[in-house]
From Swiss-Prot:
It comes from Xenopus laevis (African clawed frog). In adults, expressed at varying levels in different organs including the liver and brain, with highest expression in the testis. Keywords: Coiled coil, Cytoplasm, Nucleus. GO terms for molecular function: protein heterodimerization activity. Belongs to the CCDC89 family. It is found in: Cytoplasm; Nucleus. This is Coiled-coil domain-containing protein 89. The lineage of its organism: Eukaryota, Metazoa, Chordata, Craniata, Vertebrata. One of its GO terms (cellular component) is cytoplasm.
């Protein structure tokens, strides 16, 4: 029974060594993981560049809007100046019409004064001597006739002047209406110009704020870019360090593989020696020797397994650190 149990344990140890030796080393997967992470870094840098381009496009659009507002402000100022000149011309024409109206009033007053003087002259002539009065009556009659003609002409002229005055009054009212309309238009244009100035001032303030925001975003983007470059350099250093560590681990794995092969050969030799010496040596002593060798082989196998687990843990720590760096880069970009 002890001999059969020893043979089973030797067979199980050999089978475990064969399974460990058959474990694959996937270097291609590791290279693809490294390449995938480098691609992620390139995508993050492209996203930063795209945001910088979008900020530049917004800045150009605001410059075009500011130029359009300045053009509209200039046009409003020109219209305001034109309406102001038109109002001044209307005021000049109104002053001329008012002066003509005053002249017509003075002419009418002068006519009334002359008429009154003629009447007084007639009364004075009546109080003179009779012959002279008769003579003067004739003269007065003639003068009356002349006065009638003159009055008729004056009435005609007064009517003409009245019509002209009505026409001029209508024109004056029209000009006053135009002046009021011009004043309203001038007030509207003044209000629109004021609104345009306020809009332009607000646009300039907004543009100044956007310039400050752009400068701040540019500084922040430069700062983030520097941080990303620093993180990228650290990542590259980490990748290089990991590559060197990977090469060391590959070399260690190769050494472990050689040691596993040697251990397997030792176990195979032990099994062959056990088979050769099985018939000649006492079974219990040989089994004890084989058990000791098997325990040595198991101890070597356990040591190799612990080394392999330590390597896997170190690789996992490197991968976790790399993921944390990628998450930090995404947080900076986002």
């Amino acid at each position: 029974m002890p001999g059969g149990e020893g043979e089973n344990r030797v067979g199980e140890g050999i089978q475990s060594l064969k399974q460990l030796h058959a474990l694959p080393w996937d270097e291609k997967t590791e290279n693809e993981m490294l390449r995938s992470r480098l691609d992620e870094q390139s995508q993050l840098i492209c996203m930063l560049k795209q945001r910088a381009d979008e900020t530049q496009i917004k800045w150009q659009h605001l410059e075009r809007v500011n130029g359009e507002l300045e053009r509209q402000s200039g046009e409003a100022a020109q219209r305001f100046q034109s309406e102001r000149e038109r109002g001044e011309r209307l005021e000049e024409r109104f002053a001329i019409l008012a002066s003509n109206h005053q002249q017509m009033i003075r002419f009418k007053d002068e006519y009334k004064q002359q008429n009154e003087e003629l009447r007084q002259l007639c009364d004075t002539m009546r109080e003179s001597k009779y012959p002279e009065l008769l003579h003067r009556d004739r003269c007065i009659q003639e003068l009356r006739d002349q006065l009638g003609d003159t009055e008729t002409r004056l009435k005609e002229q007064e009517m003409n002047y009245g019509r002209k005055l009505d026409t001029l009054s209508a024109k004056v009212e029209q000009l006053e209406g135009e002046k009021r309309t011009g004043s309203l238009e001038l007030g509207d244009l003044t209000h629109r110009l004021k609104v345009s100035e306020e809009t332009r001032h607000e646009a300039q303030e907004k543009l100044a704020r956007l310039e400050e925001i752009k400068k701040a975003e540019k500084a922040e983007a430069d700062k983030r870019l520097e941080e990303i470059k620093k993180e990228k350099q650290e990542l590259l250093n980490l990748c290089m360090e990991r590559g060197r560590t990977l090469q060391d681990r590959q070399r260690e794995a190769a050494e472990l593989s050689v040691r596993l092969q040697e251990a397997q050969k030792s176990l195979e030799k032990a099994e062959e020696s056990y088979q050769r010496d099985k018939a000649a040596v006492d079974a219990d002593i040989r089994v004890s020797d084989l058990q000791r060798k098997l325990e040595d082989g198991e101890n070597q196998f356990e040591q190799l397994r612990r080394d392999f687990e330590a390597y896997k843990k170190h690789s996992g720590d490197l991968l976790t650190k790399e993921r944390e760096l990628n998450s930090k880069l995404r947080h900076l970009i986002g």
